[in-house]
């Protein structure tokens, strides 16, 4: 969704680089 390397349910997950 915003940042991270993947997305799930419109939410970000992973390193926000």
Swiss-Prot record:
The keyword Translocase does not apply. GO terms for biological process: neuropeptide signaling pathway. It is found in: Secreted. Its main location: secreted. GO terms for cellular component: extracellular region. Keywords: Amidation, Neuropeptide, Secreted. The modification Leucine amide is found at residue 17. Belongs to the pyrokinin family. Myoactive. This is Pyrokinin-5.
């Amino acid at each position: 969704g915003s940042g991270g390397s993947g997305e799930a349910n419109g939410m970000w997950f992973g390193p926000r680089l």
